[in-house]
Amino acid sequence: MDHHYDPQQTNDYMQPEEDWDRDLLLDPAWEKQQRKTFTAWCNSHLRKAGTQIENIEEDFRDGLKLMLLLEVISGERLAKPERGKMRVHKISNVNKALDFIASKGVKLVSIGAEEIVDGNVKMTLGMIWTIILRFAIQDISVEETSAKEGLLLWCQRKTAPYKNVNIQNFHISWKDGLGFCALIHRHRPELIDYGKLRKDDPLTNLNTAFDVAEKYLDIPKMLDAEDIVGTARPDEKAIMTYVSSFYHAFSGAQKAETAANRICKVLAVNQENEQLMEDYEKLASDLLEWIRRTIPWLENRAPENTMQAMQQKLEDFRDYRRLHKPPKVQEKCQLEINFNTLQTKLRLSNRPAFMPSEGKMVSDINNAWGGLEQAEKGYEEWLLNEIRRLERLDHLAEKFRQKASIHESWTDGKEAMLQQKDYETATLSEIKALLKKHEAFESDLAAHQDRVEQIAAIAQELNELDYYDSPSVNARCQKICDQWDNLGALTQKRREALERTEKLLETIDQLYLEYAKRAAPFNNWMEGAMEDLQDTFIVHTIEEIQGLTTAHEQFKATLPDADKERQAILGIHNEVSKIVQTYHVNMAGTNPYTTITPQEINGKWEHVRQLVPRRDQALMEEHARQQQNERLRKQFGAQANVIGPWIQTKMEEIGRISIEMHGTLEDQLNHLRQYEKSIVNYKPKIDQLEGDHQQIQEALIFDNKHTNYTMEHIRVGWEQLLTTIARTINEVENQILTRDAKGISQEQMNEFRASFNHFDRDHSGTLGPEEFKACLISLGYDIGNDAQGEAEFARIMSIVDPNRMGVVTFQAFIDFMSRETADTDTADQVMASFKILAGDKNYITVDELRRELPPDQAEYCIARMAPYNGRDAVPGALDYMSFSTALYGESDL
């Protein structure tokens, strides 16, 4: 019967394109690779049965070795083979083998026993590949993948850590040999030095991998390196077969290793437990022995007599706590940890619990450790108490020495200081300083009383505590007490001497102070009097000189009392001299409170007496001069009080004449000129006032209470009066010119003046913008409050106030009103005239201007007219329109 291999029914460990029914022959290179690989693979299993094949298509023809191969790789017994040599026997044996393969779930397609018996290479290789797939590859599964994919995934994972290895398939990914080397190195790194391999040397890499696999891994050499390198795409089946051998080789080794590891693990656990038991016993013994040796040392309470010895014991105890005990604490802790760990491991490994030898249980060790800590606590308390006791003695002794040394240092030189006689030659301030210093010393002495008492108390306590050096302490304490009593007596004696001297010097000091208090103001009074008597006074009025004279008389009246004060001050000085002579006081001879001597007082007093008559004479002379100045003031004031109002009156009359509208302009002009003549005739009075003013200046008179008018005011008023009358006459003359030039009637002029005066409410002769606007409206001008009205008013203001002064004069008002009411020339009229001269053209030529106008006016126009640029322009054409508007200020000329 024929068996066919179905590639779709083999758990996807064959790709669909690998169809053995195709008629095409195998690639010769692939066939060669498959022959070698499959032959080597078969021999790797047949050698277990003591045989092998040489020619794959010949040696399987009788079916005997084929059945043997299946028994070896499956581990099962097949049906008994036929031993005959006939074709039918061979076909029967091959069918038995094929039936066994089919019984394993492999559907064979197009593979029949006859082709195998006939030595068909293609069918024989296909059959072997089917066997390899079923028994070498099908059972490979990684993360639920198919056989081929599982084998590929296994290769990828094993080679992932290696550089230059990227396994993606079972053909070209293996050509450089690094994939085979990586698999070997991953499982047996000692067999290959992977770091020395080169990607560009595939032959060496492949031969290295094949040789090592054959020699050390018992994997036969199934491929030739030259065939793989020389083939563009190595045969996939050959590569898969070879790689599966690596998989099974390493898988088997891993199982053996796992078994060995399991045994080693069990033994290691047992050995570790035994070691832990031994360690526990030894550690427990050592720790208990250390506790046994340490407790007697801690229970030793023999006291020491010196602080140094006790401190050494304390240092030894600190070393014990710092150096010796911590390791033992760690050992005790480790002992308990080891015991618990050991019991846990024994329990987890189903071993019996560990029972330490007698007396070495954890509880026994804890009890011993508790005894150690109890002894340690008592020892530490005893040490500290002993140290405190010795420390107290040392502290008291040191405290006594320190206080005694401080006291002795303080008393050094104090007795000699208290016996000094420095107060006999001291001044009062020095005596007071000595008393203050002595009081400070007494305070210091009182403060040291506590220290002396403390020294005695410490000495007493040292005696009570049987201090070894008590005799020297007592001797030193007695010396300090004796010296203290002597200091007290000397202190009292010095205080009494200082107080006696102070009382005597205070009497003298009080006299000195009284002298200084009275001499200083008297001296100041004399100095002030001398300054006043010699002062060069400057007065401007008779009242001022009278005030100075009165003050001087009052000063002279105080001179008798001043002389009495002088004599009293000199009496104080004489009393001091008497005391010094009587009690033989050692004085410096100078008053500490003042530098003013009696001689100085007498000298200044004599000088004051000499200055008084000189002052009398100076005041009399100044009084006469001020009387003359007063006469000049009255004379100037009388004239100024007449001229000033006269100028003001004339100014008001001129303003009224310019505003009022009596008669014609010619009448007003005549009136003003007569007025001007009367003003000019007043000039001699102004000149006379100037003369009086000159006399006042020469007399240095700067103010005049008899008038509010100064010469400067008169001059300014006079000049303003002359200017105003001249300006007013000029305005009237201009109004006459305007009236005659514009043809304004007298009635119109009067109307304009009436309107202007009505809105000139402050009589300043000018109108502000708002006043001017109201005036225009009253005259019939339509100026609205909208934008157009504002623009029109702005245009009018630019005419009447071209300099933007913010006011409109009556002359500007008349000019504007005359322009608005009279028939005057305009720019349009001039343009119309030029157009007539130009023959109704928009431009005019030079020849036409020279023909129609006088020569000078023609040249004037030619020089100022701009060229005409219109479309109808001819050469030399001039623009008379822009020229006409420029004449009236409506554009730039």
Curated annotation (Swiss-Prot):
<comment type="function">
    <text>F-actin cross-linking protein is thought to anchor actin to a variety of intracellular structures. This is a bundling protein.</text>
</comment>
<dbReference type="InterPro" id="IPR011992">
    <property type="entry name" value="EF-hand-dom_pair"/>
</dbReference>
<feature type="domain" description="Calponin-homology (CH) 2">
    <location>
        <begin position="145"/>
        <end position="251"/>
    </location>
</feature>
<dbReference type="GO" id="GO:1990357">
    <property type="term" value="C:terminal web"/>
</dbReference>
<keyword id="KW-0963">Cytoplasm</keyword>
<dbReference type="InterPro" id="IPR018247">
    <property type="entry name" value="EF_Hand_1_Ca_BS"/>
</dbReference>
<comment type="subunit">
    <text>Homodimer; antiparallel. Interacts with PDLIM4 (via PDZ domain).</text>
</comment>
<comment type="similarity">
    <text>Belongs to the alpha-actinin family.</text>
</comment>
<dbReference type="GO" id="GO:0045214">
    <property type="term" value="P:sarcomere organization"/>
</dbReference>
<feature type="binding site">
    <location>
        <position position="762"/>
    </location>
    <ligand>
        <name>Ca(2+)</name>
    </ligand>
</feature>
<feature type="binding site">
    <location>
        <position position="771"/>
    </location>
    <ligand>
        <name>Ca(2+)</name>
    </ligand>
</feature>
<dbReference type="Pfam" id="PF00435">
    <property type="entry name" value="Spectrin"/>
</dbReference>
<dbReference type="GO" id="GO:0031252">
    <property type="term" value="C:cell leading edge"/>
</dbReference>
<feature type="repeat" description="Spectrin 1">
    <location>
        <begin position="275"/>
        <end position="385"/>
    </location>
</feature>
<dbReference type="Pfam" id="PF13405">
    <property type="entry name" value="EF-hand_6"/>
</dbReference>
<dbReference type="InterPro" id="IPR001715">
    <property type="entry name" value="CH_dom"/>
</dbReference>
<dbReference type="InterPro" id="IPR018159">
    <property type="entry name" value="Spectrin/alpha-actinin"/>
</dbReference>
<dbReference type="GO" id="GO:0097433">
    <property type="term" value="C:dense body"/>
</dbReference>
<feature type="domain" description="Calponin-homology (CH) 1">
    <location>
        <begin position="32"/>
        <end position="136"/>
    </location>
</feature>
<dbReference type="GO" id="GO:0051393">
    <property type="term" value="F:alpha-actinin binding"/>
</dbReference>
<dbReference type="GO" id="GO:0005925">
    <property type="term" value="C:focal adhesion"/>
</dbReference>
<dbReference type="GO" id="GO:0030274">
    <property type="term" value="F:LIM domain binding"/>
</dbReference>
<dbReference type="Pfam" id="PF08726">
    <property type="entry name" value="EFhand_Ca_insen"/>
</dbReference>
<dbReference type="GO" id="GO:0090637">
    <property type="term" value="C:inner dense plaque of desmosome"/>
</dbReference>
<protein>
    <recommendedName>
        <fullName>Alpha-actinin-1</fullName>
    </recommendedName>
</protein>
<dbReference type="InterPro" id="IPR002017">
    <property type="entry name" value="Spectrin_repeat"/>
</dbReference>
<keyword id="KW-0965">Cell junction</keyword>
<dbReference type="GO" id="GO:0055001">
    <property type="term" value="P:muscle cell development"/>
</dbReference>
<feature type="domain" description="EF-hand 1">
    <location>
        <begin position="747"/>
        <end position="782"/>
    </location>
</feature>
<feature type="repeat" description="Spectrin 3">
    <location>
        <begin position="510"/>
        <end position="621"/>
    </location>
</feature>
<dbReference type="GO" id="GO:0001725">
    <property type="term" value="C:stress fiber"/>
</dbReference>
<dbReference type="GO" id="GO:0001726">
    <property type="term" value="C:ruffle"/>
</dbReference>
<dbReference type="Pfam" id="PF00307">
    <property type="entry name" value="CH"/>
</dbReference>
<feature type="binding site">
    <location>
        <position position="764"/>
    </location>
    <ligand>
        <name>Ca(2+)</name>
    </ligand>
</feature>
<keyword id="KW-1003">Cell membrane</keyword>
<feature type="domain" description="EF-hand 2">
    <location>
        <begin position="788"/>
        <end position="823"/>
    </location>
</feature>
<dbReference type="InterPro" id="IPR036872">
    <property type="entry name" value="CH_dom_sf"/>
</dbReference>
<keyword id="KW-0597">Phosphoprotein</keyword>
<dbReference type="InterPro" id="IPR001589">
    <property type="entry name" value="Actinin_actin-bd_CS"/>
</dbReference>
<dbReference type="GO" id="GO:0017166">
    <property type="term" value="F:vinculin binding"/>
</dbReference>
<keyword id="KW-0206">Cytoskeleton</keyword>
<feature type="modified residue" description="Phosphotyrosine; by FAK1">
    <location>
        <position position="13"/>
    </location>
</feature>
